Amino acid sequence: MTPGKHSGASARAANGGAWGYRDFRGGQKKGWCTTPQLVATMPVSPAGSHKQQNFGLNNATQPKKSISFFATMKATSVKGYTGANQSRMAVSKTVLIPPELKTVEKPNPNIKTTQVFDINGTDVTPRPLYHPDPLTGTAKPSKLLTSQEGSLGSEFISSYSLYQNTINPSTLGQFTRSVLGSSTVSKSSVSASESIAEDLEEPSYKRERLTSFTDLQVIRAAPEKIVTKEDLEKNIEIILTETETLRFFDLPTVMVSVESEEAEKVTQRNKNYEVLCRNRLGNDLYVERMMQTFNGAPKNKDVQCDKIIMEDKGIMSTAWDLYDSYNAMELVSLSVKQSVVESSSKANVLPKDQDQRLPGSTTEKNSETSSLMDIENVILAKIHEDEEDHSDAILKSDKFHQDLFFMERVLMENIFQPKLAAYRQLPVLKEPEPEEPEDVLESAKHEEVEEESKKEEEEEIHAEESTIPANLERLWSFSCDLTKGLNVSSLAWNKTNPDLLAVGYGHFGFKEQKRGLACCWSIKNPMWPERIYQSPYGVTAVDFSIGAPNLLAVGYHNGTIAIYNVRSNSNVPVLDSSESPQKHLGPVWQLQWIEQDRGTTGDGKREILVSISADGRISKWVIRKGLDCYDLMRLKRTTAASNKKGGEKEKKDEALISRQAPGMCFAFHPKDTNIYLAGTEEGHIHKCSCSYNEQYLDTYRGHKGPVYKVTWNPFCHDVFLSCSADWGVIIWQQENVKPSLSFYPATSVVYDVAWSPKSSYIFAAANENRVEIWDLHISTLDPLIVNTANPGIKFTTILFAKQTDCLLVGDSDGQVSVYELRNMPTVLETGRGDIMDTLLGSKSNQSA
């Protein structure tokens, strides 16, 4: 079939094209008829690709009528027509009618519609899927794809044929849904959903829709790139940049109130600082430079805590407690009964006529019961108050405090019984274990076996102790929370009660001064002191009186001397030298009570208090109406003896800042209390007499530093011992001004030395970091026992126990440790002084 040619065909195609019809009865292509009036031509494909076909319409069809579909629609290919491809496109479509079909148009003056009938006369007109709202106005054409109004050029036909032949349905469908569907459909037109019908009412509306299409641009999908192994191994550079700081919330801190007086000054300073920060950028006056800081290396330290002491507490209810409690309840019930009887007796006293007036009154009964309840409450409250007053009186009574005091001592003795037994050299008591009931014979045999085993164990222990060298075993320490961190400056035993110890706490250095403390400790209670005397100044010396053991003399770092009565619980001193015009101007380094003869005319002895201070004065204090002070000696600086040779001239003496030498220690002769030794800061030891206060009897030169302690030998009265800051300990003889024996065992300051009360050739020395026990009978080169201090702790004072083989050592942490001397060599009862004299006589000029 050749396509027909007619002049109206092109116009028809331009206006909207024709629309075709397929016969589904046999799947065969029907014949097509053409009319000379109207010919519809499909868009022509490129040459050689598809055949051009003409379709004719029935004569009954009205001229210039077409059906336009703007919704997305799927065109079904007709068998035998290669130009009809499947596509999804929002463009106008032409329906082709075969010649067998007849088109009949119903006359309607208002709305012109087109109906399609088959050969049998059946109406096969397609029904629209979308019914437009007649009340809605016509949609305006979109200007997105509009080229010119009222015309559709040949470019649209050519592009349409190109899409029909080359574009993939899936690609075109996506494009038409996103671009054409959204750009051409309005509220009054068809929607973007798929449809196969369109409104056929007004041709002007269709023409506006056709004129809105322009050339379509194809969006081709880029082919996916195949990723190879080389692409995976390539290095990908990712550059990270810092974004700007986003502040979600900024609340400036306010340190000064706006209403304060300093608000204006602070505001002005802030403004000046902001101006300074702004001017800093780009200013030549500011230079950036780097600084290196030193960071301390971290250290791992092990800390050992104190032993956690567990206590078992119990409550005992005795028979008299139960009796008192029950008796109190009976007293309450009796008092209530008595009140009830009294109220009833008062009611019986009333006249009979008053009782007969209100025989059945309930108000009287209620009032009587309420009054009885009130009386009971008052009685109970009064009893409770009496009990509280009674309990307060008991708790505040002196008898109760005394009972608690003794009870605490008993508990401490039970806890420290093994330690106290070792201190007093007594056997340790072991608690008997509970035994099951046995026969008498078996128990007796068992006891005999135990006694034999104990004897064997004791023999073995003695044999082992003979092989173990001498050592120090720590028993306990006098310390509490008040003394922790304070320096132990002095120790003193009570002259009458050997279980009472006075301890002074205070630092030696002027810049290290803290609060001072003087405590009286008892062996019966090592956990808490019996008396506590606090002071704002450090305590440097303490000593108990000989004639009045209850008097304790305390010297302070500010030069004050105070005397306390330890029998009283008062913390106020009985006497002090704070108001005395002769008080010391420097620290009182030593105090001692001395008994002296009253003179040739007087009988007996008198007791004086002697003190030495850093102001260069040795003073005695006499208790009369107050503390009267007299100077025994004013220590003067001495020049070293010049050893000039012949032809040498004497050098001029150096100018002295102070002509007085600070005194550090003193020691009175054990037999002749008129003679005493005084150690000075220069390193000299002066022998002085109480009868002469203008000059020294002798001067012992041997130390190169301050002399901290001088003490006489308790058995050889012509031998004394001294220690100094020059790391040395020297033994002197009274007749020889040169050292007899010198000991320099360590490179540390020796703060204190003490002779043993049981041996003339045993003494102890307290260095900064260790305690040494020397036995001159065994060796003069090495100490017999050495006990090292803990890290960071310094030993400051030392004192032997009077009646036991124990040693007390004070340190810089506020502890006074008690050590037992184990396996010491036996002490000869006779010839103590002879052995010392022989030792010093043979080695008088030997230095160790």
Curated annotation (Swiss-Prot):
GO terms for cellular component: axonemal dynein complex; axoneme; dynein axonemal particle; motile cilium. This is Dynein axonemal intermediate chain 4. Residues 359-370 have a biased composition (Polar residues). The keyword Cell inner membrane does not apply. Plays a critical role in the assembly of axonemal dynein complex, thereby playing a role in ciliary motility. Part of the multisubunit axonemal dynein complex formed at least of two heavy chains and a number of intermediate and light chains. Associated with axonemal dynein subunits such as, DNAH2, DNAI3, and DYNLT1. Interacts with DYNLT1. WD repeats lie at residues 534-574, 583-631, 658-698, 702-742, 745-784, 790-829. Pfam families: WD40. Residues 442-456 have a biased composition (Basic and acidic residues). GO terms for molecular function: dynein heavy chain binding; dynein light chain binding. Keywords: Cell projection, Cilium, Cytoplasm, Cytoskeleton, Flagellum, Repeat, WD repeat. Its main location: cytoplasm. It comes from Homo sapiens. It is found in: Cytoplasm, Cytoskeleton, Flagellum axoneme; Cytoplasm, Cytoskeleton, Cilium axoneme; Dynein axonemal particle. Residues 345-370, 431-464 are annotated as: Disordered. GO terms for biological process: axonemal dynein complex assembly; cilium movement; hematopoietic progenitor cell differentiation.
